[in-house]
Amino acid sequence: MKIKNVVVIGSGTMGSGIAAHLCNANVPVTLLDLKTEISEKARERIHKSRPPLLIDKSKINNIKVGNISDDFDVVKDADWIVEAVVERIDIKHQIYDKIFKARKDGAIVSSNTSSIPIKVLSEHLSDIEKKDFCITHFFNPVRYMGLLEIVKNENNDLNKINQLKEFCEIELGKGAIVCNDTPGFLGNRVGVYAMQVAMTEAFKMKLSI
């Protein structure tokens, strides 16, 4: 599997960050949102971002923009479709329905959710669709945070998951780890626990802020 073309759906902080980082890796990417104007504003934010999301700002126009009503046909040519919309399960399910009707056979579909279980996200997908569906949880800001969690489901083609992991490590420079579908995945699960331990110890020691 070769990833030569990516579509990111959702141009908020995470979606635009993912699109920018793909652009940094010279991977053709299209950023879609409800309206083209929203995607265009996201591209402007990428161009003006501090710290910069782009290594070379002259590449900004390599990020194509569009909307999910008029430009959804771009999905059919994508090797990887990343969903990065608001954390509402009903909206994500609607997006997946559109994606799986439009995508080419074998194209990877992933969600950037930070906490919704993959079992919930994929509950309306067929076993064949689940084979190509996973979670790719990037951390913010995408360019500077090294960790990437890839959460698999029980139907995944593990060879394809490993190829995606390799792409993200080699082409995107990420420290990619494959996780099971557990609450908080790995990063948030460990991070929240560490913060709670720190707060508990601070209370015990009667530390002030």
Where are the predicted features?
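Rossmann-fold dinucleotide-binding core
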Residues: 107-189
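Helical "substrate-binding/catalytic lid" subdomain
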Residues: 169, 180-209
